[in-house]
Amino acid sequence: MIRVVRRYEFSAAHVLARSDWSDARNRAVYGKCANPAGHGHNYRIELTLEGVVDAAAALDEIVAKRVLAELDGRFLNQEVAAFARVVPTAENIARHIWDTLADTLSPARLAGVRLVETSNNSVEYFGSEPSP
């Protein structure tokens, strides 16, 4: 089987904090990432596809319209509906990207989403867990 990996980049800000927790608990769990003023990242998405992958231009257009337009340049907690009640951790962002794209790439199949948040932190999601 051949897999194709396509990469995309976006910048976004977020706060890692649960509204049902105290500030002290959020700081204890999320550290400096719980700063109410937020912080930003230059993210890299790596999509792994299997099967027949249509022209890269078509894939790029789908990702641009469905993912990048929603996430790039945004304060995720405040501007993206998916994160109104879900903490926008790297894991949850990767899951959201999967949920957004998984049914739109036929005849190809989305096999994985890798989200690189920093040089030391990345996550991979393979669609095996339901969204929160």
What are these regions (language model features)?
Residues M1-P132:
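Charge-rich, low-complexity N-terminal segments
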